[in-house]
Amino acid sequence: MISKSRRSFIRLAAGTVGATVATSMLPSSIQAALAIPAHRRHGNLKDVEHVVILMQENRSFDHYFGTLKGVRGFGDRMAIPLPDGQRVWHQKGSKGEILPYHFDTSTTSAQRVDGTPHTWPDAQQAWNEGRMDKWLPAKTERSLGYYKEQDIAFQFAMANAFTICDAYHCSFQGGTNPNRLFLWTGTNDPLGQHGGPVTTNDHDSNGPVEQGYTWTTYPERLQAAGITWRVYQDMADNFSDNPLIGFRQYRAAAPDSPLIVNGLSTWKLDALKRDVLANSLPQVSWIVAPAKYSEHPGPSSPIWGAEYTSWVLDALTANPEVWSKTALLVMFDENDGFFDHVAPPAAPSLNKDGTLRGKTTADATLEWHTKGDIRYRNQPYGLGPRVPMYVISPWSKGGWVNSQVFDHTSVIRFLEQRFGVMEPNISPWRRAVCGDLTSAFNFANPNNEPFPELPDTSQADAIVASQIKLPKPKPPAVAAMPKQEMGIRPARALPYELGVHARYRSGGDALSLTFANTGKAGAVFQVFDLLDSENPPKRYTVGARKRLHDSFQGDASGDYHLEVHGPNGFLRVFRGNLRRDLAERKAPLPEVRIDYEPLFGNLRVQLINRGRHPVKLTVKDNVYRQGERRTVNVPPGQRREVRYSLRSSGNWYDFSVSAQGADSFLRRFSGRMEDGRSGFSDPGMGLGTLTF
């Protein structure tokens, strides 16, 4: 477990505005409740008897946690390339280049910063089919603003106290209502059969019975299965964030119908606390915050959102017995327009002739926009950018990070796993790629992880009032790359076992790649061609225990330079020249393949020479072994093996292979070997992008 000083957990946001505000612990009742052991009757998911879901508004992961240690933030060495060859941090607009910059709440009004464009058209523009190079034209310069721990102390403390998910994506490239529909129903009706496809905030308030959506929502499925549920909200002030109001069956329901009583009635946080104290908390609950506390930029602020979250915790922990059986999931519906550097996994884009730019083993029919606005016809709906996700429960304490790919449908899938109520609206592609959140919990041995102190939020109004008078934040005159705090945090085991293997295609006119997935979860490989600035990356969705093959041409001179990006820092780099490497088979023909040996903690590197002449290959460590080099002579037609123990690096690896006599040849392999056990985050996080 990663320790942190007591003082850092009680640092208050007020300190950043020069005000002297007394700090204190959260109420002692909360501390006492959080310290009690988790309910452990079965030692598995059945111990969770209540799931509470709080979806807040409009913050991206980098915007909040790019500087948090031990997560995939600003120190990511595997940041994707832009079409101009620079890394994704270097966004360009009409005023030139801007890097992510600090929303300093001590000198600016950043607590109440204005929002940015966040609709389907501008989200598609910023993403740009995966190029990720249009954030400034689409989202304004505010999109690159981010906070530090001193600005959002409560949010950092939550991440350090419980579990933060750093690969949780919003479901849809766009705004509030479509994303909330994925959380409550698993879909946006992509085929337009029941009032969709939903790409805007239509029907987010009450309307005529004959208007609205008609597909089945997940609360209805819970009701039919006898699972208790409720939406806690103030119907007079829920910021239009309850999407159930847009469904005809809810609009037409009788006043005493469960759809009205539990879905469209006022149940504020005091009602939540009463239900907790009375041991009548439903099995599944959704919470919708008022506008002021929604965390939405403009009408709300991070510290108001923190205050509301602390009230939710206060209510849930008022009865320690109930809290010992409760999981609270807190996420954000979308990123607003705030920048996040990770290219979202998505179904393949389509070429102009309608063919896929990539491949998929999972049915992605429901992932493309085929109805409605022709401007975005055939564009993938998602996934969208990463958003923060906290898993708060007695089974997820200890400052963990979980890096499995999730989206809003993952919340429904968690409920499926716990209560057995299936949601057929979730697409096959999302089921293949997005997990069910169970990997974020420790049910077997949950009670050995202490709970650190949390900041007080009682002075939120005073802090916001003092900051609102300060100047608005703006980019600095001289751009500089932000620094992520160095350090590690405990990391949950993931279900990935991925590989990409290269070989020259027979005939020598292309490089053939095999995308192999021998793990338990699907993954998206994104292939960036650094010599092709015109086309978007190709994407390959490979389901569990499946593989795909494809070939890649070189440029006019035979050069090729490919980067393959996957989940949790998975990276493969392939560089060389097809003509020089293959001309009359006189040049060396090296190939490199790696295999995992998790039982022994080893990585096996196979160095292969398919040419007619000997080749000398040098294997160089890039991060974890102080630049160690091993040079191996490989005779023609043979192979040699090199093994690396990964135990000292927590199974993380990053090395490159070059070939004497083939100057352009380079292979790079980076990632983590999963062995079914929890470990720790990448010790090399924070070093920045490596160049070769």
Swiss-Prot record:
<dbReference type="InterPro" id="IPR007312">
    <property type="entry name" value="Phosphoesterase"/>
</dbReference>
<dbReference type="InterPro" id="IPR006311">
    <property type="entry name" value="TAT_signal"/>
</dbReference>
<dbReference type="GO" id="GO:0015628">
    <property type="term" value="P:protein secretion by the type II secretion system"/>
</dbReference>
<dbReference type="InterPro" id="IPR017767">
    <property type="entry name" value="PC-PLC"/>
</dbReference>
<dbReference type="InterPro" id="IPR008475">
    <property type="entry name" value="PLipase_C_C"/>
</dbReference>
<feature type="signal peptide" description="Tat-type signal">
    <location>
        <begin position="1"/>
        <end position="35"/>
    </location>
</feature>
<dbReference type="Pfam" id="PF05506">
    <property type="entry name" value="PLipase_C_C"/>
</dbReference>
<dbReference type="GO" id="GO:0034480">
    <property type="term" value="F:phosphatidylcholine phospholipase C activity"/>
</dbReference>
<comment type="similarity">
    <text>Belongs to the bacterial phospholipase C family.</text>
</comment>
<protein>
    <recommendedName>
        <fullName>Non-hemolytic phospholipase C</fullName>
        <ecNumber>3.1.4.3</ecNumber>
    </recommendedName>
</protein>
<dbReference type="InterPro" id="IPR017850">
    <property type="entry name" value="Alkaline_phosphatase_core_sf"/>
</dbReference>
<dbReference type="GO" id="GO:0016298">
    <property type="term" value="F:lipase activity"/>
</dbReference>
<keyword id="KW-0732">Signal</keyword>
<dbReference type="Pfam" id="PF04185">
    <property type="entry name" value="Phosphoesterase"/>
</dbReference>
<keyword id="KW-0378">Hydrolase</keyword>
<comment type="function">
    <text>Hydrolyzes phosphatidylserine as well as phosphatidylcholine.</text>
</comment>
<dbReference type="GO" id="GO:0016042">
    <property type="term" value="P:lipid catabolic process"/>
</dbReference>
